[in-house]
């Protein structure tokens, strides 16, 4: 589904618990696939597939380190996700304030 905007892909990617666990681990610093797989209940190839989804969603990026690839959180993708969340939160608070104001008008 390549028509989604980047934040939509990010939200979709984070709907999976294993991918959320990977993001949480990477919040502590860069790690290679093997290091990530060590503490997850899935195989190393499965971790690689999850990382591919996270990379497509721009939540992680990678760099070569010898014979390995090291993954880290992608600040650009996380910023887009934060902007999307802030926009949602602002709309929710505005709606709540309007509801409170309208209930006050009824009394």
Swiss-Prot record:
InterPro entries: ArsR-like_HTH, HTH_ArsR_DNA-bd_dom, HTH_MetalResp_TranReg, WH-like_DNA-bd_sf, WH_DNA-bd_sf. DNA-binding ability is not susceptible to zinc, nickel, cobalt, cadmium, lead, copper and manganese ions. Gene3D superfamilies: Winged helix-like DNA-binding domain superfamily/Winged helix DNA-binding domain. Changing residue 35 to G: Does not bind DNA, but retains the capacity to form dimers. It holds the Pfam family HTH_5. Induction: Negatively autoregulated. Keywords: Activator, DNA-binding, Repressor, Transcription, Transcription regulation. It comes from the Bacteria. Residues 33-56 bind DNA. Residues 1-93 form the HTH arsR-type domain. GO terms for biological process: regulation of DNA-templated transcription. Signal peptide: none annotated. Involved in the regulation of lipid metabolism and hypoxic response. Positively regulates transcription of various genes, such as phoP, groEL2 and dosR. Negatively regulates its own transcription. Acts by binding to a specific palindromic sequence motif in promoter regions. This is HTH-type transcriptional regulator Rv2034.
């Amino acid at each position: 589904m390549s028509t989604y905007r980047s934040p939509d892909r990010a939200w979709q990617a984070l709907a999976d618990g294993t991918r959320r666990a990977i993001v949480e681990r990477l919040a502590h610093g860069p790690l290679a696939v093997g290091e990530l797989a060590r503490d997850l209940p899935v195989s190393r190839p499965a971790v690689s597939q999850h990382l591919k989804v996270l990379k497509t969603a721009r939540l992680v990026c990678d760099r070569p380190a010898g014979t390995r690839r090291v993954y880290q959180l992608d600040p650009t993708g996380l910023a887009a996700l934060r902007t999307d969340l802030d926009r949602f939160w602002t709309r929710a608070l505005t709606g709540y304030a309007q509801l409170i104001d309208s209930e006050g008008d009824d009394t």
